[in-house]
Regions:
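Type III/flagellar secretion export determinants
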Residues: 1-225
Length: 225
């Protein structure tokens, strides 16, 4: 499944403090001075809403990556704010979507099966079949286009359901791979992953037959590959 873990290395200006002043030579300020009236006035004059969730998320990130004795500046804060949406949720830089950040708080809740569009299941089925045949059953992370399928799904889902949708699609992907594996073995009992698959071995496997009687919630337990 494709999801994104928070990167504490987001870029914004930090400089070590070598003096006692709260503002350095290039107009930056110590993070400990963020809530001072002078810095708040500068932020508001620059068009930054210091009451917004977007701003608060950016400041939280800055504080977690540095400390009060380090420096930041207005442009750095603006740049960091662009990584968050109006709700203060991290925006993935690859697909421009929020709601895909795995945190300690949502690690458990994201692992649930929800309803996802048939079009996404069909897209995953077709890609899994194509790659299974091309790679002779090998799960090749270097050549797969799975990320595209997951990103297409995420765009169809509401922000709050994106992680769970990805988790659900991963289960269907496992079901499809297992169905193709079983069909290849049925066509040639001596077949092994990495060896050429017998022509037509997967022709009888449709998405409907692959899913028949299978529960996505049990996919991890039932699948062998």
């Amino acid at each position: 499944m494709m999801f994104y873990v928070k990167n504490n290395g987001l870029c914004f200006l930090f400089q070590k403090s070598f003096g006692t002043s709260g503002v350095n030579a290039i107009g930056s300020f110590q993070l400990s001075q963020l809530n001072s009236s002078s810095v708040q006035s500068k932020l508001k004059a620059a068009g930054i809403n210091t009451n917004s969730k977007q701003y608060k998320a950016a400041v939280k990130q800055m504080m977690s990556a540095g400390n009060g004795a380090m420096y930041g500046n207005i442009q750095g804060i603006k740049n960091l704010m662009s990584h968050y949406d109006k709700d203060g949720d991290y925006i993935n830089p690859v697909n421009g979507l929020a709601g895909l950040l795995v945190t300690d708080e949502n690690e458990s809740s994201r692992k649930r099966i929800i309803s996802i569009p048939d079009s996404s299941k069909e897209e995953m089925y077709e890609l899994t079949k194509k790659e299974f045949l091309r790679e002779n059953g090998v799960h090749n992370g270097d050549t797969t286009k799975r990320t595209d399928v997951y990103n297409n799904l995420y765009r169809k889902m509401s922000k709050k359901d994106r992680l769970a949708a990805g988790y659900t699609l991963e289960k269907y992907e496992r079901i499809y791979r297992q169905a193709f594996y079983d069909a290849a073995k049925k066509a040639d009992p001596n077949w092994e992953i990495g060896k050429p698959i017998k022509d037509g071995a997967l022709d009888s496997v449709t998405r409907e037959t692959a899913e028949s009687g299978k529960s996505p919630a049990q996919a991890t337990l039932d699948t062998k590959i």
